[in-house]
């Protein structure tokens, strides 16, 4: 079966999975995210005090939309409304809530803080992080999953080419940069520190857990790869 036939088959599987696994919910979420992207762009264009928030909102909605699109491309049989990663974890949801509260409190009481010109630095870094994560996911293809795999699939191979030559977990690196950058855009001084610490703690545990399984799956090949290539997260080998 050539590549075009595989893509066509995956499209059929994706459509079937979409119809079976919460088509209405997925449609509603997609619509909501699309509105969020449009509203964010409108704020950036027309608002003087909420331009940063507009970029943040558009970037946040784009992130979740892309996560869903990626699953339709490479894991159509696992497609569901959960593929948007909207309910990633209680910690992630709490961090988002705190960042929103911080932004609006500071916007109301210290409006000058939210018009500080460095928001564009965060925007550039956020786009960079999104691109790195997207490239990593595309390079890994079906070998990349949202959940840590505890059993090796027959088609699971060790990916060390492309961006994986330079870091073992480029998708985590991209997400780490992306998450901290969103708080730079919002000019949330407390959440910048909080997101950095929370993201590092999360990936520290996840990488250790994931690599235990990868060593079981690939043995010496992964051990050698681990020794020679950086993890992608500062302070984590």
Curated annotation (Swiss-Prot):
Domain of life: Eukaryota
EC numbers on record: 2.1.1.100
Primary enzyme class: transferase
A single GO BP: regulation of G protein-coupled receptor signaling pathway
Keyword Lyase assigned: no
An example Gene Ontology molecular-function term: protein C-terminal S-isoprenylcysteine carboxyl O-methyltransferase activity
UniProt key word Membrane: yes
UniProt membrane topology term: Multi-pass membrane protein
Transmembrane segments: 26-46, 53-73, 92-112, 116-136, 184-204
Binding sites annotated in the UniProt record for S-adenosyl-L-methionine: 149, 156-159, 164, 169-172, 210
Residues that coordinate or bind substrate: 206
Pfam families on file: ICMT
The reaction(s) this protein catalyses: [protein]-C-terminal S-[(2E,6E)-farnesyl]-L-cysteine + S-adenosyl-L-methionine = [protein]-C-terminal S-[(2E,6E)-farnesyl]-L-cysteine methyl ester + S-adenosyl-L-homocysteine
Cellular component, GO annotation: endoplasmic reticulum; endoplasmic reticulum membrane
Coiled coil: none
Record function comment: Methylates the C-terminal cysteine residues of small GTPases and the heterotrimeric G protein gamma subunit in response to cAMP. The methylation is required for intercellular signaling and regulation of cAMP waves propagation. It also seems to induce the activity of car1, a G protein-coupled receptor which senses extracellular cAMP during the aggregation phase of development.
Protein name per UniProt: Protein-S-isoprenylcysteine O-methyltransferase
Source organism of this protein record: Dictyostelium discoideum (Social amoeba)
Gene (name only): icmt-1
């Amino acid at each position: 079966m050539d590549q075009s036939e595989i893509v066509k088959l995956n499209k059929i599987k994706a459509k079937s999975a979409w119809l079976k696994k919460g088509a209405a919910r997925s449609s509603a979420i997609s619509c909501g995210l699309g509105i969020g992207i449009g509203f964010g762009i409108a704020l950036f264009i027309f608002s003087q005090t909420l331009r940063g928030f507009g970029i943040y909102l558009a970037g946040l909605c784009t992130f979740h939309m892309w996560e869903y699109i990626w699953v339709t491309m490479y894991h159509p049989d696992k497609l569901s409304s959960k593929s948007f990663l909207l309910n990633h974890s209680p910690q992630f949801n709490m961090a988002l809530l705190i960042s929103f509260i911080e932004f609006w409190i500071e916007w109301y009481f210290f409006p000058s803080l939210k018009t500080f010109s460095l928001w564009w630095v965060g925007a550039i870094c956020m786009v960079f992080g999104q691109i790195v994560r997207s490239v990593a996911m595309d390079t890994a293809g079906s070998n990349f999953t949202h959940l840590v795999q505890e059993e090796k699939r027959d088609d699971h191979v060790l990916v060390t080419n492309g961006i994986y030559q330079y870091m073992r977990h480029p998708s985590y690196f991209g997400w780490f940069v992306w998450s901290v950058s969103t708080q730079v855009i919002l000019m949330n001084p407390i959440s910048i520190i909080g997101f950095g610490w929370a993201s590092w703690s999360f990936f520290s545990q996840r990488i250790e857990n994931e690599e235990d399984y990868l060593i079981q799956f690939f043995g010496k090949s992964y051990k050698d790869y681990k020794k020679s290539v950086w993890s992608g997260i500062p302070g984590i080998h």
